[in-house]
């Protein structure tokens, strides 16, 4: 009987994993041909010029946190760097984390997680940036993360429409924009040369753990009982041109 129960559980898990794989969201990340981008503030204009469309971060995965700010993002790459642009409207904003690798997820925060091809299934990178441009970069598996050092962090160009100084929570509706230029060299656990034709997986998030109205939104849906973004099993497919 125990053997049959184990077989049934295994079949169920295989079916669920297969359904998840077939249901994975997909994003094509176009290559844009620009010389070195000297400032992240240029990114929105570049993506406008290249007609890169916005995607919504709109999955509310946990009914205990129903608030859904308006969040859009778009992504492209230059070969040796990923360009990200977020546009967000929410009830309040906060940027208390004053240093890189701080608790930016407690602030108004936009995030990008990615698993590189050929890496171990449980390993992935997380790039988390608050609305004042403070950045956290981590790598490894859930519960065993290594933070990036000063050089990979400094290599990421950031721009926020709210400036770069920390501030306490500001109440009232606020629309803000964030842009990042993430070079291949900031993937500090790899000797990554470029993103050309890369087939990766990942997810895009918006959170604010300590805002007056906490929220946890994702681009690709997450089927877990409690808020958790560190879940590569629910990443979508990322196709780099």
Predicted regions and their residues:
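Short, Lys/Arg-enriched N-terminal segments with co-localized hydrophobic residues
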Residues: 7-23
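Structural preference for beta-rich elements and adjacent junctions enriched in aromatics
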Residues: 22-241
């Amino acid at each position: 009987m125990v053997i049959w129960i184990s077989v049934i559980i295994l079949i169920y898990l295989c079916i669920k994993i297969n359904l998840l794989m077939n249901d994975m969201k997909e994003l094509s990340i176009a290559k844009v041909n620009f010389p070195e981008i000297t400032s992240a503030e240029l990114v929105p204009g570049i993506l406008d010029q290249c007609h890169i469309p916005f995607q919504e971060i709109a999955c509310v995965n946990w009914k205990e946190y129903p608030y859904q700010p308006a969040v859009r993002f778009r992504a492209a790459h230059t070969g040796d760097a990923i360009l990200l642009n977020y546009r967000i409207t929410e009830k309040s904003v906060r940027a208390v984390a004053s240093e890189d690798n701080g608790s930016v997820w407690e602030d108004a925060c936009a995030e990008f997680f990615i698993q590189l091809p050929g890496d171990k299934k449980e390993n992935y990178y997380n790039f988390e940036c608050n609305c004042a441009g403070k950045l956290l970069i981590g790598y490894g598996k859930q519960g065993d993360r290594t933070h990036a050092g000063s050089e990979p962090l400094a290599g990421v160009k950031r721009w926020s429409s709210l400036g770069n100084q920390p501030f306490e929570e500001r109440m009232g509706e606020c629309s803000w924009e964030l842009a990042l230029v993430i070079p291949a060299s900031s993937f500090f656990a790899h000797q990554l040369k470029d993103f050309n034709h890369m087939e990766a997986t990942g997810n895009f998030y918006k959170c604010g753990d300590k805002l007056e109205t906490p929220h946890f939104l994702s681009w690709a849906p997450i089927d877990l009982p409690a808020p958790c973004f560190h879940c590569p099993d629910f990443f979508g497919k990322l196709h780099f041109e």
